[in-house]
Swiss-Prot record:
GO biological process assignments: ribosomal small subunit assembly; translation
The UniProt record lists the keyword Zinc-finger: no
Subcellular location: Cytoplasm; Nucleus
General function of this protein: Required for the assembly and/or stability of the 40S ribosomal subunit. Required for the processing of the 20S rRNA-precursor to mature 18S rRNA in a late step of the maturation of 40S ribosomal subunits. Required during oogenesis and imaginal development.
Subunit structure as annotated in this protein's UniProt entry: Component of the small ribosomal subunit. Mature ribosomes consist of a small (40S) and a large (60S) subunit. The 40S subunit contains about 33 different proteins and 1 molecule of RNA (18S). The 60S subunit contains about 49 different proteins and 3 molecules of RNA (28S, 5.8S and 5S). Interacts with oho23B/rpS21.
Pfam families in alphabetical order: 40S_SA_C, Ribosomal_S2
Main localisation: cytoplasm
GO MF entry, a single one: structural constituent of ribosome
Family note: Belongs to the universal ribosomal protein uS2 family.
Gene Ontology CC terms, in alphabetical order: cytosolic small ribosomal subunit; nucleus
Keyword Translocase: no
Protein name: Small ribosomal subunit protein uS2
Length: 270
C-alpha cells in the first residue's frame, strides 16, 4: 500500500506506540470477514492483529478523507465514551464535523427534522455501537470508514481499519495517527518533523480518576504560609460625643423665661 516508499512505511516509533497501547490485541472471537487481518491466535485465545495491514488501511482511510474537497463534509462519530474525546480532538485539527455521544436517528435520512445532515464520508469508532449511522449511511450511499476489532461486523463498511477498538489508549492512538496522516497528506505538517501534538490529548480520562488525581496533587502541595499579624499600638481617642453633648447642654437657654405669658382672658377679648 505504501508503494515501496520508505517514507510511507511504518516506523519503529509508531510500532512501539501501538504495542504499548495494545492496538494489536483483538478479542477472542473472529468475524469471518476479519480473518484476513489476524496474524495468529495466542494460547489464551486472544487474536493478534497484523499491524502491517492496520497501517496500510490507515493510509488508505487518510487518502479517502483528503479526497473530500470540503473537510466539514467528513463526519467523525463516536457513541462510546472512550472515543468521544479523540473524535473531538480529531475534528479540531482536521476541520471535520464531530458527533460525540448519542446519534440522533434520522439525521441522514429524515429531511424534516432540524438535525438533518448530508455528509459525504463517515468515520466511526466502533461498528457495533455506531450501527445506527452506518445503517442510515447505507440508505443514502455514504461511504463509511470504521475502526474494527476481530469480532466487528463489516456490513456496509467500505474501509475497515483493524485495531483494538475496546481500549481507551488504543482508540485514542488510532485517531491520533489518522489525524497526523491526514495533515501530512494535506501538506500541513512535514513527514520529517515530529507532530507537536501529543497523543495523550486523545486519550479518554475518567472524571472520577481525574478528581482523584487533582485531590492527590493538592495533598502534595506545601501548606500555605501564614503571615504573622503585628499588633500596632492604638492611640487613645477622645470621645467627641461626650464633649459635643456637654457643650450642647451648657449653651442651651431656657426659652420659657423670655416668653411673655399673656392671658387672653384678662383683656376680655375672645
Amino acid at each position: 500500500m505504501s508503494g515501496g516508499l520508505d517514507i510511507l512505511s511504518l516506523k519503529e516509533d509508531d510500532i512501539t506506540k501501538m504495542l504499548v497501547a495494545t492496538t494489536h490485541l483483538g478479542s477472542e472471537n473472529v468475524n469471518f470477514q476479519m480473518e484476513q487481518y489476524v496474524y495468529k491466535r495466542r494460547a489464551d485465545g486472544v487474536n493478534i492483529i497484523n499491524l502491517g495491514k492496520t497501517w496500510e488501511k490507515l493510509q488508505l482511510a487518510a487518502r479517502a478523507i483528503v479526497a473530500i474537497e470540503n473537510a466539514s463534509d467528513v463526519f467523525v462519530i463516536s457513541s462510546r465514551p472512550i472515543g468521544q474525546r479523540a473524535v473531538l480532538k480529531f475534528a479540531k485539527y482536521t476541520d471535520t464535523t464531530p458527533i460525540a455521544g448519542r446519534f440522533t436517528p434520522g439525521a441522514f435520512t429524515n429531511q424534516i427534522q432540524p438535525a438533518f445532515r448530508e455528509p459525504r464520508l463517515l468515520v466511526v469508532t466502533d461498528p457495533m455501537t455506531d450501527h445506527q449511522p452506518i445503517m442510515e449511511a447505507s440508505y443514502v450511499n455514504i461511504p463509511v470508514i470504521a475502526f474494527t476489532n476481530t469480532d466487528s461486523p463489516l456490513r456496509y463498511i467500505d474501509i475497515a481499519i483493524p485495531c483494538n477498538n475496546k481500549s481507551a489508549h488504543s482508540i485514542g492512538l488510532m485517531w491520533w495517527l489518522l489525524a497526523r496522516e491526514v495533515l501530512r497528506l494535506r501538506g500541513t505538517i512535514s513527514r520529517t518533523v515530529e507532530w507537536p501534538v501529543v497523543v495523550d490529548l486523545y486519550f479518554y480520562r475518567d472524571p472520577e480518576e481525574a478528581e482523584k488525581e487533582e485531590a492527590a496533587a493538592k495533598e502534595l502541595l506545601p501548606p500555605p504560609k501564614i503571615e504573622e499579624v503585628v499588633d500596632h499600638p492604638v492611640e487613645e481617642t477622645t470621645n467627641w460625643a461626650d464633649e459635643v453633648a456637654a457643650e450642647t447642654v451648657g449653651g442651651v437657654e431656657d426659652w420659657n423665661e423670655d416668653t411673655v405669658k399673656t392671658s387672653w382672658g384678662s383683656d376680655g377679648q375672645f
